[in-house]
Each structure stands twice: as C-alpha cells, then as structure tokens.
Design a protein with these regions (language model features):
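C-terminal region of N-terminal signal peptides and the immediate post-cleavage residues
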Residues: 11-27
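Alpha-helical segments in soluble extracytoplasmic regions
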Residues: 23-101, 105, 115-139
Length: 140
C-alpha cells in the first residue's frame, strides 16, 4: 500500500514538473522564433535580405510558434497553478502569432499597409511578453 502511494505521488510530481517544463520549453522555442523573425525583418528593412527570404523566415517562425501552442493544448494540467500557467502561455503565444501575422502582412504588402515598422513593433511587443513570461515561469 505504501509502495503504491509513493508510486502515485512520484507520478503526480513528475506530471506537475512535466507541465512546467513543457510550458518553459514552449516559451523558449517561441522566443527563439520571434528573435529570428525580428532579425529577418530588420535585415529586410535594411535591404540585406530578400522579401522571399524574409517571408520564408516569418512563415517558419509562425509554424514554430503554432507547434509550441499545439503542444500546450495537448497538456492535461493537474493543478490550478499549472492550468493558469498553460492558459497564460497560450494567451501570450496567441498575441505573438498575431504579431507574426502582422509582420508577414507588412512584408507581403505592396502598399506598405501595415508598414515594416508596425511589424517590427508587433514583434518587439511579442518578444517583451515572452520575456515577461519567462521571468514569471522562473527563467527556465
């Protein structure tokens, strides 16, 4: 009986750590994707990267972010704290996806609406939200 209880406790502890680790990994991966997108956008604005390469980079960054989001959606958090962490991360990732979409639209736009500056501001805001979430999650 004690062995069964200890086994169940170990499983619950591992599962709880798993949610935290998964959220942290998703945030880190998304931060990397946003940083890459910002670099591509700045290189495009400086005339050092083609529009096609910038578009591909932004598409890849969005795919990475959506993969992280899908990973979080598959979690089954067991505690209220874990549920709140997952929900907050999903909210931030949704905002980041919107920022990436704005940046993609800016690169693809023939009439400069939205502008590259708007896309850059959206990506900077996304990076800030991810950084805040990283600090809140313990910097993992």
């Amino acid at each position: 009986l004690i062995a069964a209880w200890l086994g169940a406790l170990a499983c619950l502890t591992a599962c709880a750590g798993g949610v935290t680790d998964t959220v942290s990994t998703a945030v880190q991966d998304s931060s990397s994707a946003i940083a890459t997108a910002r670099l591509a956008l700045s290189q495009d604005a400086a005339g050092k990267l083609t529009t096609a390469a910038t578009s591909t980079t932004l598409d890849d960054a969005l795919k990475e972010l959506l993969t992280s989001r899908d990973t979080l959606l598959k979690l089954s958090p067991g505690t209220e704290e874990d549920r709140a962490a997952v929900q907050e991360a999903l909210t931030v990732l949704d905002g980041c996806a919107a920022g990436l979409t704005t940046a993609r639209d800016a690169v693809a736009s023939a009439d400069s609406a939205p502008s590259l500056a708007t896309g850059d501001r959206e990506l900077a805001s996304a990076a800030d939200r991810l950084a805040e979430l990283t600090v809140k999650e313990g910097g993992k």
